[in-house]
């Protein structure tokens, strides 16, 4: 699974996921299903934001990669992927500027057009089940919820899907592709089933000679990214700016 993740996802996504896991004492090389889930959720958040801008009239517009529109404002502020301190700083700044209610939990995005925080979910189960779980946890009508599944289903607060159909189809296609690629490598069953994942983890640890003296139970600490999912491509023009904002790269 680790090899698949590194081959399948943008290097920046992988780096952000590794950073989030290590912050909570989790090892991406061992908890590989969690690694894949975090990467998937991060990429969906970035894809949700890609190419969506607000023009000088305050209207939402879609600008494909390569068009020189530096003066346009990005419609979505990406909160997911930042360390917790910076993420809350961004949230507080948005609340102070816009007057919106501060959420109890860190959301994934902020929509400057609709003036609301957005919680993104990516589920391997039925979308309505996961939607209800997330809604019960957040307990706030102010935060908009949008759930995607690997089967092409989606569910959103008041059936308001925020994005145009083409943008959502791009996300669904990417999720379906990830599922197909996992299945072709024999990884999908363990990704979906916790029992199968635990069996595979024990097998991997044994093959690496790491079982002796180590608990086989996986850590229950939850990474910030994993809190927003259960357990795709990016706008290349935005990658450099995001990297500068989200990561402090070490010189090798």
Curated annotation (Swiss-Prot):
It comes from Influenza A virus (strain A/Goose/Guangdong/1/1996 H5N1 genotype Gs/Gd). Pfam families: Flu_PA (PF00603). Plays a major role in the shutoff of the host protein expression by cleaving mRNAs probably via an endonuclease activity. This host shutoff allows the virus to escape from the host antiviral response. Hijacks host RNA splicing machinery to selectively target host RNAs containing introns for destruction. This may explain the preferential degradation of RNAs that have undergone co- or post-transcriptional processing. Its main location: host cell. The record marks 202-203, 206 as: Important for efficient shutoff activity. GO terms for molecular function: RNA binding. It comes from the Viruses. Belongs to the influenza viruses PA-X family. The active site is at residues 80, 108. GO terms for biological process: viral RNA genome replication; viral translational frameshifting. The probable endonuclease active site in the N-terminus and the basic amino acid cluster in the C-terminus are important for the shutoff activity. The C-terminus acts as a nuclear localization signal. The C-terminus is recruited to host protein complexes involved in nuclear Pol II RNA processing. Keywords: Decay of host mRNAs by virus, Eukaryotic host gene expression shutoff by virus, Host cytoplasm, Host gene expression shutoff by virus, Host mRNA suppression by virus, Host nucleus, Host-virus interaction. This is Protein PA-X. It is found in: Host cytoplasm; Host nucleus.
């Amino acid at each position: 699974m680790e090899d698949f993740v590194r081959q399948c996802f943008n290097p920046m996504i992988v780096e952000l996921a590794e950073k989030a896991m290590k912050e909570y004492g989790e090892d991406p090389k061992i908890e590989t299903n969690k690694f894949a889930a975090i990467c998937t959720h991060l990429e969906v958040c970035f894809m949700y934001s890609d190419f969506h801008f607000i023009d000088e009239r305050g209207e939402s517009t879609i600008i494909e990669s390569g068009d020189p529109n530096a003066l346009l404002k990005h419609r979505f502020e990406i909160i997911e992927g930042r360390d917790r301190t910076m993420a809350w700083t961004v949230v507080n700044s948005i609340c102070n500027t816009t007057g919106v209610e501060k959420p109890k939990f860190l959301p994934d995005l902020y929509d400057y057009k609709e003036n609301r925080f957005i919680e993104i979910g990516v589920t391997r189960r039925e979308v309505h089940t996961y939607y209800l779980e997330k809604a019960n946890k957040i307990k706030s009508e102010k935060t908009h919820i949008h759930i995607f599944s690997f089967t092409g289903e989606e569910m959103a607060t008041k059936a308001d899907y925020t994005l145009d159909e083409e943008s959502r189809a791009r996300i669904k296609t990417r999720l379906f592709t990830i599922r197909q690629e996992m299945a072709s490598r024999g990884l999908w069953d363990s990704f979906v089933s916790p029992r199968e994942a635990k069996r595979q983890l024990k097998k991997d640890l044994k093959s690496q000679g790491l079982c002796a003296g180590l608990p086989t139970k996986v850590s229950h600490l939850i990474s910030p990214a994993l809190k927003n999912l259960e357990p795709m491509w990016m706008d290349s023009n935005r990658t450099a700016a995001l990297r500068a904002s989200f990561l402090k790269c070490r010189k090798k």
